[in-house]
């Protein structure tokens, strides 16, 4: 797929996944939708990094990636407390409705502002691409990254109780 199309599809999957979370009739549907959004989210940032670097001069590539990931950082810093506030005041589904709305806006922004790639999509061989996972150092690096991010996001689970019950912050 062309890169812009890939970004749009991934954002659509992410948005639909969050909509499914907001409408989930039971726990297992919620978890399945969360897994769907996780795959789309991670892949989106991989493709987004490639798109960001393709839009700027060689000496600006690192800055382009930094700017793109600043959005993720800001979303984490502001979105987690805001989502918690929404959930506490309007119910947990409100948080997923809010993220769905953000996804719709992001989809529109991508559609309007990201230029279409002039280059044809690169051909790929899935078997060759996955063969790199047979190399120990690559697998170790990937596992380290996954475990690191699992740790980061696990902390978010306990952050609110830690702040309210241990340090005495109010809800």
Predicted regions and their residues:
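Helix-loop-helix hairpin linking two adjacent transmembrane segments in secondary transporters
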Residues: 25-29, 58-60, 67-112, 158, ...
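Hydrophobic transmembrane alpha-helices of secondary-active solute transporters
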Residues: 37, 41, 72, 106, ...
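Conserved MFS/SLC helix-loop-helix module at the cytosolic interface between two early adjacent transmembrane helices
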Residues: 1-25
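A generic transmembrane-helix signature of 12-TM secondary carrier transporters
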Residues: 11, 15-18, 33, 100-107
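Small-residue-rich segments within alpha-helical transmembrane domains of MFS-like 12-TM solute carriers
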Residues: 22, 38-46, 77, 153
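Cytoplasmic helix-loop-helix junction between adjacent transmembrane helices
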Residues: 27, 33-71
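Extracytoplasmic gate region of multi-pass secondary transporters
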Residues: 139-171
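Juxtamembrane intracellular "pre-TM" segments in multi-pass secondary transporters
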Residues: 114-144
